[in-house]
Amino acid sequence: MPYEWENPQLVSEGTEKSHASFIPYLDPFSGEWEYPEEFISLNGNWRFLFAKNPFEVPEDFFSEKFDDSNWDEIEVPSNWEMKGYGKPIYTNVVYPFEPNPPFVPKDDNPTGVYRRWIEIPEDWFKKEIFLHFEGVRSFFYLWVNGKKIGFSKDSCTPAEFRLTDVLRPGKNLITVEVLKWSDGSYLEDQDMWWFAGIYRDVYLYALPKFHIRDVFVRTDLDENYRNGKIFLDVEMRNLGEEEEKDLEVTLITPDGDEKTLVKETVKPEDRVLSFAFDVKDPKKWSAETPHLYVLKLKLGEDEKKVNFGFRKIEIKDGTLLFNGKPLYIKGVNRHEFDPDRGHAVTVERMIQDIKLMKQHNINTVRTSHYPNQTKWYDLCDYFGLYVIDEANIESHGIDWDPEVTLANRWEWEKAHFDRIKRMVERDKNHPSIIFWSLGNEAGDGVNFEKAALWIKKRDNTRLIHYEGTTRRGESYYVDVFSLMYPKMDILLEYASKKREKPFIMCEYAHAMGNSVGNLKDYWDVIEKYPYLHGGCIWDWVDQGIRKKDENGREFWAYGGDFGDTPNDGNFCINGVVLPDRTPEPELYEVKKVYQNVKIRQVSKDTYEVENRYLFTNLEMFDGAWKIRKDGEVIEEKTFKIFAEPGEKRLLKIPLPEMDDSEYFLEISFSLSEDTPWAEKGHVVAWEQFLLKAPAFEKKSISDGVSLREDGKHLTVEAKDTVYVFSKLTGLLEQILHRRKKILKSPVVPNFWRVPTDNDIGNRMPQRLAIWKRASKERKLFKMHWKKEENRVSVHSVFQLPGNSWVYTTYTVFGNGDVLVDLSLIPAEDVPEIPRIGFQFTVPEEFGTVEWYGRGPHETYWDRKESGLFARYRKAVGEMMHRYVRPQETGNRSDVRWFALSDGETKLFVSGMPQIDFSVWPFSMEDLERVQHISELPERDFVTVNVDFRQMGLGGDDSWGAMPHLEYRLLPKPYRFSFRMRISEEIPSWRVLAAIPETLHVEMSSEDVIREGDTLRVKFSLLNDTPLSKEKQVVLFVDGNEYSVRRVVIPPFKKEELVFKVEGLKKGEHLIHTNLNTRKTIYVR
């Protein structure tokens, strides 16, 4: 006979039928939890014995006579790995043991035995007594007073036992034996830590002999979504009562008004009573307006309360509707996880999660990949979040082939059905739940089909979701079309045809490490085309465990950090918040893209405000506008705007007189009063518009500049600043300002970035390795300099591996300014470029940075919608985000200028017109070498990156997808320039030293050719200035555009272009360009 923990047809023994959750009850008026009078919490310390397997526990451990005085104590709820027993194991797909379903390891099956003596009051024995386990992983036996009661498997739904006949007044012994591995483990392969133990609440409660066993509340709305209907099923159970009892049902409105709906006398028997009630114009429940009604049910002494809401979920013409309005799923996936408690998540942590989600415009959470604690759903009802409730089924490590998958094996049918049914029965009254999800990545087959058909009969008020069906095409038994990580062309293809089902991305925007690029691009498509209804980002929280290294430094641990094998490393670090719920930069982008107010510029002073909320008028928010001049607020005003959901209103802004500065208009909406999830003033939506681009002033510099040279160095002195260049390397080696050394290392061209997790997934370190070499192995090909009256230009030419070329020019002016110019001419056969810029280090004393550009958090080419143009100031140590696995971090995009300061001296850098930059208190090599944030050393320097740009982050997935094409630095010529100055004050960023702008262009070709010959038109472009020139040369033949070529001409260099013109007919032809060159040729 197989063991009970290795038989999927045995799902439980001795347990009660599933029912709706009633304990504790969340009072929607006070926000407090209520417990019944006859209630004993068994949370707290239990005696605990840990064994290698179930065969190594003492034979009579459940006996009342057994002496457990030398056992340890353990907290319940908890995961025993988090208390030092066994090791945490993280895998994504593979099982931690050799899969052979339904069998699990015999010798290595960690087992925990829990014992606790409890006192039962004597008056309880007039009633029925139940023991409730909300969650035990993965299999457990129960003994009471030495008698075996039963067992249960599903780790994420309750197991409840009737104990009336085995308990006695006074002292009683509860014994629980928990096995880490069971056949149930094959259905719990859910990309998370493999923990074990009694990790959710445990309690005893008593009910009258004749009591309400279950309640099912359903609501509907009429065709106008105005009036409502309540459908109520009350299941009563009699275990020995002989007298009739009064059943009373009372409706309590969100305003606290009470109305009796039912009052009748019922016989003491097992039965279900069904009722229907009409409610005129009830307040509707939604994530925006979570109006909760209460049904108070009394049967004699038994009283139960159920929160519910009036709402309707449906599909019409392929569109997902909620209370008649098209619903966008602006969601995240969430694992139940705490860095200190594992899966034993506290209510405080749940509330923290929900408030953060609401504050960042998230409206949906998918309980990936199992039913959560019951309190989570109460809180989602109360605060307002849509929930995709997912059954505790994932068999990812088993082949999904129809002949192999557990979803098609008859012996696994009961296990699938039991888990899905237990979820539905427990959670069926929560208005926040809009979809039942059958599971995740568990193949497709008849076991899911049967469960889905049962749901449709049991609950017709919600939709059924299961992504696994789409792997074999659409399935009739699910209501929505769901995919994971689809590329945008798949969305566009789906939207191009008439569809019956809405498209939901149950997982998208894989947020591993520094990620979630191009989120706005996805939502531009979603909001433009039909049938597309959003999705849930993977995922909410980095599953990193708080740990200390050998030096006592804290870090977030991931797979492999506990000696666990097999493991999947940091693939559990996919969140938009850190393990302690510190927001990651991605979360700010999510908030911006998910916002429900759209603002568009209609004319210079008129703006269209569109209300994209479904049930909220914009009058609920305070509007405000600000005008920023060069990043500083110069005018601001508040306003109110009345706009019903879906309406648009025009907003007129009185604009000031504007000089040559840069001006931005910022329009925002914030909460006008406190809510349960955020305080008054919390910004829910904003947009920023460029009112006027800056005008740069070109100023002649009259101050002189000196030049000295020796065998190794070239020294340029201007005002109080000295620039030292190496003749051996061609680099700017040192800057001295009033004899203070500014540089700790030379200014070097840099084409590499520390790989992100997405980069590693698409093999960027291997594919683009030549650019890492280019940053280190450049060879100085040529160096020359030129002194003029008010400036010195130092020009270096470098050859890079792969035969690419870099040209750098430093032009030092008499006022101390230096213009830095870089041209990159990649070879034809090199791959795309990770980054284009310069890198250098300065002393650690330069520990404060100010900038004008996007902020305050980090932004990147494809993740910068949330970056607000303004002036900012931070400590260098605050400029990076501490990703769990160190990687590229801290970039600021579209920066006009930045300045590093040591309190006296400022290193000022301004773009021409803009740059990206980042600063780190360590080196790039440090960042790339270490695997945990605690390993980053303390350095006596600050690394400074001044960049044209780096490629986007991507995020479609983290196992192969590259940044979208429009966010990649393809191998073609690039140029960029910036200005640098060392001074005591921040200079004007819009005043530049005047330099020649001349570009000499010559065009030549044959004067006469024969018909059929090719005409070769040659252009020579001489750049005799210290700045690179980028030109687009357009060739016209007889007034018609013939060809376009782009060229970058480095400083002091001549470039040649040759156009070939074919097919000229006999006669005279005019050849000219957009560069004011022309020539007439003749064809014979």
From Swiss-Prot:
Catalytic activity: Hydrolysis of terminal non-reducing beta-D-galactose residues in beta-D-galactosides
An example Gene Ontology molecular-function term: carbohydrate binding
Primary enzyme class: hydrolase
InterPro entries: B-gal_small/dom_5 (IPR004199), Bact_Beta-galactosidase (IPR050347), Beta-gal/glucu_dom_sf (IPR036156), Gal_mutarotase_sf_dom (IPR011013), Galactose-bd-like_sf (IPR008979), GH-type_carb-bd (IPR014718), GH2 (IPR053692), Glyco_hydro_2 (IPR006101)
Record SMART domains: Bgal_small_N (SM01038)
Source organism phylogeny: Bacteria, Thermotogati, Thermotogota, Thermotogae, Thermotogales
GO biological processes: lactose catabolic process
The name this protein goes by in its record: Beta-galactosidase
